[in-house]
Amino acid sequence: GLITKGDLTVSISTGGTCPAAAACLRERIENAIPDGTEDVLEWAHQNRERLKKHRVLKQAVTKAFSLNRPLTEEEIGAIIGNL
């Protein structure tokens, strides 16, 4: 089954081996995706080039997901300033 949250798509399949297991895993993974995921992905899309330029894209996205929200300009500046 597919899990879709905004631009995030996760697919779970057992190749027909055990659809019940796939359904169970799908539910667990869906419940593990934080509520702010769609907002973080949209924010990451809008700031991707700037963050890539400073080589902090992964660090900034990791921080945003840990907070379950997009980073503020101040938080981005702090990450870029710590280079």
Where are these regions (language model features)?
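Rossmann-fold NAD(P)-binding glycine/threonine-rich loop
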Residues: 1-14
